């Protein structure tokens, strides 16, 4: 997003706040979808709500034809509130809530993570013999990182889960799911796709209705960030690696193939605007304190240096190395290590690429959470999340009655 956009917003609100780039999100989403569908026409996006469940963003995905991928009753209820049909909601996760049964009775997509969950599905089937319950299985695989989720091919747990489901004629295993976020490289994507094709032949009768490959793709990103990852695959390269096994196996009747992107589609298109409060040197370390926190940026700021836009600058000193620290009383509240350049109190900075696991992970620690605005394709600015208040934070607590204080 251009510096001028951030500057124009400063006249309307105080820092800190988030800025969502609607047009950038749409273009990136469509680029991912087009690359995949060029190779495999029946590809679909199921957007990961846990990554960023801002209703405006989730509804934007809905308007673009995407499915909702949820992992809790809270997220499921959000998708329903936004008007999703159950057939376009994918309910995953290892600890599904009580809405799972309602979702399955209503024709929704859900994937069994463990035998205990399979037993729940079996109980539902017994209690509702007139219902046809379609279910998927979550497959675990070793791609250089062994996830804790799902059940391994050939394992006793997977066999137990399948046996529980097969006891009921009204339960149909129609799909498979996997999710491995720790290996984003092309060989791993080709391998996971082939494993899923082979598992479908083994565990699904006939052509599956769907196979989900989960998430774990690099996104389109700023060059500052790209350089820290090395050779980042393009969407076209991912499409060739991940979709070709399905074209080979299903040349005619094609199941839906999902990926479940979160950071891939949203990370780059949210920025966090914050102000420098103070600069001081403690022993040999120069520290700038900002009115935001590393919690506002998501876990990526603990692993990589985020792209940074110096929105407004005063006549400050030029520093060789300044650690940009947050407002909290935590020693580890480091937003960016080793900033070099001019800086002075009052300067406004925009941290970019903060759309993933930021607002959904930010606690109400010391301060209420800040607002978010969206810049729409025509330039309109819309507030899509207001700043929290004292009442928002404390309304759920029980206070002592007057006279008991």
Regions found by a protein language model. Give the residues of each.
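A charged N-terminal "starter" segment
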Residues: 1-133, 163-172, 377-405
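Charged (often Lys/Glu-rich) extended helix/loop segments that serve as interaction or gating elements
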Residues: 9-10, 247, 252-405
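Conserved, mostly hydrophobic/aromatic
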Residues: 25, 50, 72, 137, ...
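Active-site-proximal loop/turn and secondary-structure-junction residues that shape catalytic pockets
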Residues: 51-53, 74-75, 95-97, 114-116, ...
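Short acidic, glycine/serine/threonine-rich loops at helix termini
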Residues: 58, 81, 101-105, 122-124, ...
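Structured core elements
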Residues: 90, 111, 136-138, 177, ...
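Active-site loop/helix belt of alpha/beta enzymes
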Residues: 141-275
């Amino acid at each position: 997003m251009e510096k001028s956009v951030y500057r124009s917003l400063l006249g309307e609100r105080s820092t800190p706040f988030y800025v969502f780039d609607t047009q950038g999100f749409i273009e990136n989403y469509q680029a991912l979808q087009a690359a995949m569908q060029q190779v495999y026409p029946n590809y679909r996006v199921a957007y990961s709500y846990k990554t960023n469940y801002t209703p405006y963003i989730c509804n934007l995905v809905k308007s673009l034809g995407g499915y909702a991928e949820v992992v809790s009753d809270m997220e499921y209820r959000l998708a329903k509130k936004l008007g999703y049909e159950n057939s376009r909601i994918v309910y995953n996760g290892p600890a599904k809530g009580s809405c799972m049964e309602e979702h399955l009775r209503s024709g929704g997509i859900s994937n069994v993570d463990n035998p205990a969950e399979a037993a729940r599905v079996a109980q539902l089937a017994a209690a509702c013999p007139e219902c046809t319950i379609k279910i998927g299985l979550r497959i675990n695989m070793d791609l250089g990182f062994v996830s804790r989720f799902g059940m391994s091919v050939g394992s006793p747990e997977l066999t137990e889960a399948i046996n529980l489901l097969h006891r009921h004629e009204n339960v149909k295993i129609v799909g498979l799911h996997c999710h491995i976020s720790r290996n984003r490289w092309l060989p791993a994507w080709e391998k996971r796709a082939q494993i899923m094709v082979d598992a479908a032949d083994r565990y699904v009768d006939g052509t599956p209705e769907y196979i989900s490959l989960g998430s774990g793709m690099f996104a389109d990103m700023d060059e500052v960030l790209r350089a820290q990852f090395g050779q980042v695959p393009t969407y076209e390269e991912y499409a060739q690696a991940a979709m070709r096994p399905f074209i080979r196996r299903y040349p005619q009747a094609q199941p839906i193939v999902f990926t479940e992107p979160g950071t891939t589609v949203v990370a780059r298109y949210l920025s966090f605007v914050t102000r420098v409060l103070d600069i001081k040197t403690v022993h040999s370390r120069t520290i700038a304190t900002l009115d935001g926190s590393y919690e506002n940026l998501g876990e990526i700021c603990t692993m990589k240096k985020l792209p940074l836009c110096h929105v407004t600058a005063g006549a400050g000193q030029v520093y060789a190395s300044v650690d940009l620290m947050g407002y909290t009383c935590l020693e580890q509240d480091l937003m960016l290590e080793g900033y070099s350049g001019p800086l002075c109190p009052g300067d406004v900075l925009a941290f970019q690429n903060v759309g993933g696991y930021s607002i959904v992970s930010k606690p109400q620690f010391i301060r209420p959470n800040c607002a978010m605005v969206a810049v729409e394709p025509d330039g309109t600015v819309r507030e899509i999340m207001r700043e929290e208040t004292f009442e928002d934070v404390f309304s759920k607590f029980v206070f002592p009655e007057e006279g008991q204080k």
